[in-house]
Amino acid sequence: GVLKAASAAAVRNRPMSAKIQVRPVNPQTCQTLIAAGADPLIARLCAARDVAGPDELLDKLSALLPYTLLKNCETAAVRLADAIEKQENILIVADYDADGATACAVGIKGLQAMGARADFMVPNRFENGYGLTPEIAEAAAAAGARLLLTVDNGIASMAGVARAAALGLEVIVTDHHLPAEETPDCIIVNPNQKGCGFQSKSLAGVGVIFFVLMALRAELRRRNYFSDELKEPNLGELLDLVALGTVADVVPLDHNNRILVSQGLKRMRLGKMRPGIRALFEVARRDWRKAQPFDMGFALGPRINAAGRLDDMSVGIACLLADNDAAAQTLAAQLNDLN
């Protein structure tokens, strides 16, 4: 018995063997990065992470991929611009998780900043299933919606899109999940769909709707829509939400995603963020002045995901949409209690 206990203690106290993965480094890329002014250690780390050249180290917004490469992005922008000009009711169909919630908040805030009549709906997946189902299409029609916009879902909603069409509703699907052979019969913006030349296949759902909003702003600008009464919005103000959703969805941080996250974190560290994000930092006892990807993935994201355990799954979205600190703090506390 004594021997058994001693051997068990030895196993418990044995240091864990670390598994070190050595990534292959392209020496030519490494030299190019050093020649461009990168520190040799940073150059080696970047070359081992498939950074192809110095341009990929730029984190300016101007280095983002152009939305023109994202298939149907401009088509979606034209339809949304028409809806805004006609003041049609746009209903966003979202999911409650961190990517879906941030995508919904980005969609609502971006559309409203451009004068749209926009609202959202979060299907209760235990009652209605996931995403745009026929039941959700019927509820949307009953609520007076004219155009449905899915965020972070919809690529598999064949039946829901068909039911919406039968009810006279049009649908735009924005999603990033891998499509099956059959896709819904509507406008689809998804970097992973067939024939899409957008190089960042890792764009999160929140990133897809952000690119659609950039295309929409350009389309409205082309129509001379903005004026002194309704000024052109600064979409950079949504990057705190984009960064949060991108990190929390654990998509690979390719160059395009790295720009979105880096810019969002810079804004957070300056205190430029939604009251809901600030409140989530506070309840998680994290310092937003030193915001890191860790905070997004392990402190804020899980608290938004906790809304899935509530009867009302839209509490996470409500927290992100809150326009004042008091409302944001109440909702963040609710999410914190659940987490």
Where are these regions (language model features)?
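N-terminal amphipathic/basic-hydrophobic helices that include classical n-h-c signal peptides
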Residues: 1-15, 335
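Short catalytic-loop micro-motif centered on adjacent basic/acidic residues
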Residues: 92-93, 148-150, 173
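Short, ordered loop/turn segments at secondary-structure junctions
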Residues: 95-96, 123-126, 153-154, 169, ...
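Short alpha-helices
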Residues: 106, 182-226, 238-242
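Phosphate/diphosphate-binding loops
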Residues: 147, 151-163
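Amphipathic alpha-helical transducer elements in NTP-driven molecular machines
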Residues: 158, 183, 203-206, 210, ...
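Short, glycine/polar-rich helix-capping loops at beta-to-alpha or helix-loop-helix junctions
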Residues: 159, 174-184
